[in-house]
Amino acid sequence: PESRTVLQQLRFRNNLVRARTRIANSLVAIALSCGAVRRFSVLTTKGRRRMAALKMSEEQAWQRDRWFEFLDGLEPVITEVERKLEAEAKKDPRVCRLMTQKGVGVLTGLALVHVLGPPERFATSRKVAAYVGLDAVESQSGQRRHIGRISKQGSRLLRFLLVEAAQTSARCDPELKAVYERLRRKKTHATAKVAIARRLLVRSWILLRDQIDIDEFRRRGRARCGVKPGQPEETHGL
């Protein structure tokens, strides 16, 4: 019941944010049709002033005002849901442990804990990746084996949050940044980003399974690779 409630809140928040994005895009479309040279954020005070300064027809102005009314109604609801989720995260040591990994915030941490459930039910990292749909689909033609796109089974919400988190991790986590840059030389940005999301997922599963934080995870990685404290870290698998 607890996991169901948290996941319902996460999905509700996600739907609200998607609605806000659709409204913002509709407002930008009005701005562009009224002579705006480039896209701009309509979610800021400055953006609203720019919208108000544009010359537009009476009908366009009416639509603009209605869209802003919808936005004004959404914002406090999004804020309220996010406060509930933050409170839930703060009291859960599992989420706090996951958030020691750069890129994993409140939303991703909660989704990981409540989608995966007990970490011991997954025997291997491949089973975790398959459960979330971040495993590569294999096909065979004659003597050739082809590894294609991810299967996209399981929780769409968790996959989305992990891919979003991967963008931050690829910038802020030295190990994952090195992996991303290496992959980016051979693959597309999207492929590299999904690969980082998969590594984040497996790391998170290990943190949950072993009840450790990211510092202990790295210490174990250095020990496994024979790297002494103070030496430059090499990427070590995950």
Predicted regions and their residues:
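Hydrophobic (often cysteine-bearing) scaffold residues that line and stabilize catalytic clefts
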Residues: 19, 23, 70, 104, ...
